[in-house]
Curated annotation (Swiss-Prot):
Disulfide bond entries: 30-83, 34-59, 43-64, 47-66
Domain comment quoted from the record: Has the structural arrangement of an alpha-helix connected to antiparallel beta-sheets by disulfide bonds (CS-alpha/beta).
Matches recorded under Gene3D superfamilies: Knottin, scorpion toxin-like
Entry protein name: Toxin Cn1
Length: 86
C-alpha cells in the first residue's frame, strides 16, 4: 500500500515539474506585449486563465512569460508562423 502511495506521489510531482513555460502569443503569432517589466498583474492574469492553466506570469523582455502552462497552450515562437498575421 505504501508503495502505491509513493508511486502516485511521484507521478504528481513529475507532472508539476514537466509543466510547459513560455511566452503567450496573440492571434497573429506575436508575443503578448507588456511594458511593466517584472511582476505584472496583466501577465499574471492572462497566464492563469482557466483555458491556459498557467501557475504564474510576469513581464520579461516586453512579453508575457508564463510558468506551468498546459501542453495545449501555444507559446512563442510558433512553428511555420511569423509575427505578421499572414
Amino acid at each position: 500500500m505504501n508503495s502505491l502511495l509513493m508511486i502516485t506521489a511521484c507521478f504528481v510531482l513529475i507532472g508539476t515539474v514537466w509543466a510547459k513555460d513560455g511566452y503567450l502569443v496573440d492571434a497573429k503569432g506575436c508575443k503578448k506585449n507588456c511594458y511593466k517589466l517584472g511582476k505584472n498583474d496583466y501577465c499574471n492574469r492572462e497566464c492563469r486563465m482557466k483555458h491556459r492553466g498557467g501557475s504564474y506570469g510576469y513581464c520579461y523582455g516586453f512579453g508575457c512569460y508564463c510558468e506551468g502552462l498546459s501542453d495545449s497552450t501555444p507559446t512563442w515562437p510558433l512553428p511555420n508562423k511569423t509575427c505578421s498575421g499572414k
